[in-house]
Design a protein with these regions (language model features):
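N-terminal active-site segment of His-dependent metallophosphoesterases
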Residues: 1-68
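His/Asp/Glu-rich metal-coordinating catalytic cores
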Residues: 49, 60-178
Length: 178
């Protein structure tokens, strides 16, 4: 059996512009502290795999310290961690996914197409992709079908399900089932 935790849309370093300045600063501090509470949760519940589906940062160029804090928190986890950058924190020049040193247990998807990672000990195959720009009009799952090979296949993507406008990795419900 595999135990996994999924998360997304942390939006670290958000300005919280609708809040008064002091409250916004408190929320940013709380968001950063949450990372280490998450690490404690993962370790305390024997989680094997952490799947983070994008927009961990509110922009593609957050404060360096925030990227380093996230890397430190993920490094404390005794789980394997996979990250699929989203439309706010897309993978590209200057992004923390390139500028921060990430721990050995963290894999960041870097391509705007599905990449495959295998974990033979768990009979698991993970498919993930990264936004490499703020918009991704073509769906990452278009034309994909998981092979019937007896392995557990998990997809890790940041996107929208059945959107009216295709801007952020449009995903059709039928594609999820494939």
């Amino acid at each position: 059996m595999i135990r996994f935790l999924h998360g997304a849309d942390f939006h670290l370093d958000s300005a919280f512009g609708a809040l008064p300045a002091q409250r916004a600063a408190e929320r940013r501090r709380e968001s950063r502290e949450l990372l280490f509470r998450l690490a404690d949760y993962v370790n305390g519940h024997d989680i094997d795999l952490v799947l983070l589906a994008g927009d961990l940062f509110d922009s593609a160029s957050p404060f360096r310290e925030t990227g380093e804090l996230l890397a430190a928190a993920l490094g404390q986890m005794r789980a394997r961690v996979f990250v699929a950058p989203g439309n706010h924190d897309w993978y590209g020049p200057g992004s923390p996914y390139l500028t921060v040193k990430w721990p050995e247990n963290v894999h960041i998807f870097t391509q705007p197409r599905l990449e495959t990672m295998e974990w033979p000990e768990k009979n698991l195959v993970l498919h993930g992709a990264a936004f490499t720009h703020g918009e991704q009009a073509d769906g990452f799952l278009t034309g994909f079908t998981a092979p019937a090979d007896g392995k557990l296949h998990i997809g890790l993507l940041h996107g929208e399900i059945d959107p009216s406008e295709a801007r952020y990795d449009p995903i059709r419900k039928e594609e999820i089932a494939a």
